Amino acid sequence: MKKFLAFLLAVLALTFVACGKDKDIESYLDMERINSEFNIEKQDNEQIKFTDKDESRSAYRIFNFQKMKSVDFKNPKKIDKLEEFYLGKNCDIIYKDESTIIVLVLAQDNSYAYNIQNFDDSKTELMIAVSIGSDKELSEDELFNLLDEAKSFLK
């Protein structure tokens, strides 16, 4: 009887894990808030991309959430590969740790473009990206606030 119960619990646990992996991306996000505050540019089961409704903001934001394959998510060199890519494009690395990279992509004529990429496994294996176009230079704290805002969309 114990073996049967243990087997049943194992099957239920595997079913729960499998169900979590098969959920649509929107099941992890506050879609009501996103729909009310942003324009959804692209959406499918694996990713969603949304932008500010107010295009005249001083810091225009594009948010992108994407489910990743486990093998790619668990790659310990994913941030290093991103850093190498950005450095190859002559971008400035503002911040980097094991799960986040913040990059100044362009600074020209009082226009600044930033990319923030974060890998989050609190709900599922997600890549969170925020692209920012700004008419002023943003501080590291302001950029982290934008990352926090992106994470606030997670349920």
Residue positions per predicted region:
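Signature of long, low-cysteine stretches enriched in small and polar/charged residues
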Residues: 84-121
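C-terminal motif of bacterial Sec signal peptides marking the signal peptidase cleavage site
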Residues: 15-18
